[in-house]
Amino acid sequence: MKRTPHLLAIQSHVVFGHAGNSAAVFPMQRIGVNVWPLNTVQFSNHTQYGQWAGEVLAPAQIPALVEGISNIGELGHCDAVLSGYLGSAEQGRAILAGVERIKAVNPKALYLCDPVMGHAEKGCIVPQEVSEFLLDDAVAQADILCPNQLELDSFCGRRAQSLEDCVRMARGLLERGPQVVLVKHLAYPGRCEDMFEMLLVTRDHSWHLRRPLLAFPRQPVGVGDLTSGLFLARVLLGDSWVQAFEYTAAAVHEVLLETQACASYELQLVRAQDRIAYPRVRFEAQRLAF
């Protein structure tokens, strides 16, 4: 019997709706990965509602919880760590300490960093110290880096001017440590405005993918968290980088189709769960010559 992968997901959690672990955990479980959720915050709802209640986990609790898993002899079974939104650089350093602890007992474990800073419409949404931590520390430790366009631009200190420029910038990030860069949402000048574009860059090749851009009165939150989680899960299940890339684009599109059909602000993960497991659509990644 094939072993089921185990993944430690360190990010935010909301009681109502879907963001952070609340957007990623169930879909990863649905496709066959055991997820260990470590919630860095517990809020009533995501912050785009404008008001929320809840509290942030003390940074010292992160390595303490990782050590607790070690104490029962299970830490070596962890195949990957996923991190998302950070409330502080101290929290980020605590996560990297946990990653280091896991890699000490399982050197094959992967670390996916979703370097949440913001997006093109809203700009940067994290403190400067978090941006600096992601640039100076997290990139070097990540095996997989999943920025959006704003985050790619922030890492490289300039705005991308074309698709080829995005590839060059991603390759520059690979020189700092990661094995692969997945740009979850491209927003370079001159792109096709009615398509949602993504980019996958490894040390050897690059791939570009387009899917239809769906319109919403209010853009659902948690799409990036869902994307990062599904990509990592499929890699753990044995997909190649490109297979995981194509699957993720299709599965996320299925969730958005269901969300749009329900006229919902929150991602319709439960209603779309069978389509997450078995997407009906397929988007083929095009290998780039540059």
UniProtKB/Swiss-Prot annotation:
This is Pyridoxal kinase PdxY. GO terms for cellular component: cytosol. Homodimer. It comes from Pseudomonas putida (strain W619). GO terms for molecular function: ATP binding; magnesium ion binding; pyridoxal kinase activity. Its cofactor is Mg(2+). ATP binds at residues 114, 151, 184, 211-214. Pathway: Cofactor metabolism; pyridoxal 5'-phosphate salvage; pyridoxal 5'-phosphate from pyridoxal: step 1/1. It catalyses: pyridoxal + ATP = pyridoxal 5'-phosphate + ADP + H(+).
